């Protein structure tokens, strides 16, 4: 080495190059140091560091021993203050004190506390820079990560690649839960399928499961679609039959299922309810005759005129009156036949 004096510590100042002179200070001095108003990282770590962090191989020097009462407490205090907040001369690289660092000694660790807190590595930094280090910030410091996709997509499109947060905003899915199974899309049937379903419905209102499967396979539909179609068709058919039954004077209880008849055939109920319709159908072909005969006797004007005009005839014998009445009835029958022919034609 051309400059051995730079690496070897000067003999006159052994205590200035020894770091951590306050490690073995008593609690009274540490409490005195705790009242220091500086909030630098060096001061905080040095004061709060326990004695277990002593460097390996370091032997306390006479200057690091507890001071005598009434002796140079001020000197140790000044020495500690020099290490805690070194002056501007000690932080410059050109001074001989900063040229030799504690890390050069073999007993110190490369990343130990003494090497970190030494004055040599911090020649380029200042207390203002230490205090002005910005904290770790995200793209949106005022919003949580779960709200970032909404803001990122609409208002901040350029910040989507700054902080990728996978799997964000999952609480709407947890609130909704599983999707409902019953939500089926409405099926649209073709004309051929609708005609085949209607034809099967006319045969049997309640289709059996084997027939339902066969019909579904034949029409290319699902079993559930055929089942739902039959349910809807039965409800529509029952509503129409109930309206007919109620309009004809029946009661709704006849349409409800019972133990004896769990599946009531509303077509039979509709025929039983309006019984007059069946009677009218039976009386349809022969109904005009009794009505005409019943109304012909009092309603015929000729029949009303003959008794008035032939009022003196009742004095005549009964034999003479009988042929007249017979002729009157014969005339009325002829007229009725003529009327019947007219109505039929």
From Swiss-Prot:
Record's compositionally biased regions (Basic and acidic residues): 300-309
Regions of compositional bias (Acidic residues) in chain numbering: 330-345
Identification of the protein by name: Homeobox protein DBX1
Gene3D superfamilies (alphabetical): Homeodomain-like
Pfam families: Homeodomain
Region (Disordered): 55-103, 241-345
Known function: Could have a role in patterning the central nervous system during embryogenesis. Has a key role in regulating the distinct phenotypic features that distinguish two major classes of ventral interneurons, V0 and V1 neurons. Regulates the transcription factor profile, neurotransmitter phenotype, intraspinal migratory path and axonal trajectory of V0 neurons, features that differentiate them from an adjacent set of V1 neurons.
DNA-binding region: 182-241
Subcellular localization: Nucleus
GO cellular component: nucleus
Protein's GO biological process: cell differentiation in spinal cord; regulation of transcription by RNA polymerase II; ventral spinal cord interneuron specification
Family assignment from sequence similarity: Belongs to the H2.0 homeobox family.
CDD domains attached to this UniProt entry: homeodomain
The organism's place on the tree of life at top rank: Eukaryota
Organism: Bos taurus
PANTHER family reported in the protein's UniProt record: DBX, HOMEOBOX PROTEIN DBX1
Keywords: Developmental protein, DNA-binding, Homeobox, Nucleus
Annotated SMART domains: HOX (SM00389)
Lineage of the organism: Eukaryota, Metazoa, Chordata, Craniata, Vertebrata
GO molecular function: DNA binding; DNA-binding transcription factor activity, RNA polymerase II-specific
Coiled-coil annotated spans: none
Main location as per UniProt: nucleus
């Amino acid at each position: 080495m051309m400059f051995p004096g730079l690496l070897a510590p000067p003999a006159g100042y052994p205590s200035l190059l020894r770091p951590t002179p306050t490690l073995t200070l008593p609690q009274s001095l540490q409490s005195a140091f705790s009242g220091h108003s500086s909030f630098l990282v060096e001061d905080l770590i040095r004061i709060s560091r326990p004695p277990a962090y002593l460097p390996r191989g370091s032997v306390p020097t006479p200057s690091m021993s507890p001071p005598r009462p009434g002796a140079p407490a001020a000197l140790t205090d000044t020495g500690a203050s020099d290490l805690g907040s070194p002056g501007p001369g000690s932080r410059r690289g050109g001074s001989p004190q900063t040229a030799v660092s504690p890390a050069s000694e073999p007993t110190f660790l490369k990343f130990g506390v003494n090497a970190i807190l030494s004055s040599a590595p911090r020649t380029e930094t200042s207390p203002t820079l230490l205090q002005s280090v910005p904290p770790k910030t995200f793209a949106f410091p005022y919003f949580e990560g779960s709200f970032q996709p909404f803001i990122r997509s609409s208002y901040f499109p350029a910040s989507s690649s700054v902080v990728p947060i996978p799997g964000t905003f999952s609480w709407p899915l947890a609130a909704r839960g599983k999707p409902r199974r019953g939500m089926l899309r409405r099926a649209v049937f073709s004309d051929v399928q609708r005609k085949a379903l209607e034809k099967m419905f006319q045969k049997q209102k309640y289709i059996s499961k084997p027939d339902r499967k066969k019909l579904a396979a034949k029409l290319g539909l699902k079993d559930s679609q055929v089942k739902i179609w039959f349910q809807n068709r039965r409800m529509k058919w029952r509503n129409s039959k109930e309206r007919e039954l109620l309009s004809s004077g029946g009661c709704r209880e006849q349409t409800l299922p019972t133990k004896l008849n769990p599946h009531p055939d509303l077509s039979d109920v509709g025929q039983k309810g309006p019984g007059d319709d069946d009677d009218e159908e039976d009386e349809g072909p022969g109904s005009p005759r009794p009505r005409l005969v019943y109304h012909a006797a009092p309603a015929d004007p000729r029949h009303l005129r003959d008794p008035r005009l032939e009022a003196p005839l009742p004095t005549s014998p009964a034999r003479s009156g009988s042929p007249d009445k017979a002729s009157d009835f014969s005339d009325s029958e002829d007229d009725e036949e003529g009327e019947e022919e007219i109505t039929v034609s």
